[in-house]
Amino acid sequence: MAFLKKSLFLVLFLGIVSLSVCEEEKREGEEKEEKREEEEGKEENEDGNEEHKEKRFLGAILKIGHALAKTVLPMVTNAFKPKQ
């Protein structure tokens, strides 16, 4: 009976040790994956920032063009109006 208890204890102990090793490896793998995802997110965020800056720049150009059109177009139309 003592032999059976020792064998059972040994099996349980080795099983728990192997499970803890597997859990460690799984945790390390998850940490590596999270780190990789964060790096990819940063790269995408940098690309997104560039696109956002381009959109802001385009918006500024459109505003300037609109302001110029408001001031220049009346001048041009007055210049080409037939004088009476």
UniProtKB/Swiss-Prot annotation:
Residues 1-22 form the signal peptide. It is found in: Secreted. It holds the Pfam family FSAP_sig_propep. Belongs to the frog skin active peptide (FSAP) family. GO terms for cellular component: extracellular region. This is Figainin 2. Residues 23-39 have a biased composition (Basic and acidic residues). Expressed by the skin glands. Residues 23-54 form a propeptide. One of its GO terms (biological process) is defense response to Gram-positive bacterium. Antimicrobial peptide that displays antibacterial, antiprotozoal, and antiviral activity. Exhibits antibacterial activity against the Gram-positive bacteria S.epidermidis ATCC 12228 (MIC=4 uM), E.casseliflavus ATCC 700327 (MIC=4 uM), S.aureus ATCC 25923 (MIC=8 uM) and E.faecalis ATCC 29212 (MIC=8 uM), and the Gram-negative bacteria E.coli ATCC 25922 (MIC=8 uM), K.pneumoniae ATCC 13883 (MIC=8 uM), the multi-resistant clinical isolate strain K.pneumoniae carbapanemase (KPC) MR (MIC=16 uM), and P.aeruginosa ATCC 27853 (MIC=32 uM). InterPro entries: Frog_antimicrobial_propeptide (IPR004275). Residues 40-49 have a biased composition (Acidic residues). Keywords: Amphibian defense peptide, Antibiotic, Antimicrobial, Antiviral protein, Cleavage on pair of basic residues, Cytolysis, Hemolysis, Immunity, Innate immunity, Secreted, Signal. Residues 23-53 are annotated as: Disordered.
